[in-house]
């Protein structure tokens, strides 16, 4: 590892990840980079992380939100792979290892490994 980024909160870390993903996309020639996010996810309360969040209740009142996020079900590897394969604007996947905003949701064994495989 050549670099490390320290921040004060998960929200700040997610905000930086979103910015880096978009920058990566622009550097690769993608005009409108998109990030796959999961339904019922929570990523923070900045405008970018609210836009990535999968809870309409949390987003309410803060519109217009940012575009560039594609939602898929949390533990549905087939849908994730289909979207990642067929949408050429996808530059990243933002996923919580364990979802907690809508109740504790642990992914099935092998899910995160498969997500990583799709990304590489």
Regions found by a protein language model. Name each.
Residues 1-92:
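PLP-dependent aspartate aminotransferase-fold enzymes
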Residues 105-120:
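Catalytic PLP-binding core of fold-type I/II PLP enzymes
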Residues 87-104:
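Short acidic, glycine-rich surface-loop motifs adjacent to enzyme active sites
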Residues 70-73, 101-105:
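Short acidic-aromatic active-site loops that bind/stabilize oxyanions
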Residues 64, 97, 107-108:
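Proline-rich low-complexity regions
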């Amino acid at each position: 590892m050549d670099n490390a980024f320290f921040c004060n909160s998960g929200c700040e870390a997610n905000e930086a990840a979103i910015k880096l993903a978009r920058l990566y996309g622009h550097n690769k020639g993608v005009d409108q980079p998109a990030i796959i996010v999961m339904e019922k996810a929570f990523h923070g309360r900045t405008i970018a992380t609210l836009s990535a969040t999968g809870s309409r209740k949390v987003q309410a009142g803060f519109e217009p939100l940012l575009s560039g996020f594609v939602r898929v079900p949390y533990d549905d590897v087939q849908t994730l792979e289909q979207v990642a394969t067929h949408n050429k604007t996808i530059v990243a996947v933002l996923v919580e290892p364990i979802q907690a905003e809508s109740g504790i949701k642990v992914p099935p064994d092998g899910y995160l490994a498969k997500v990583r495989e799709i990304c590489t």
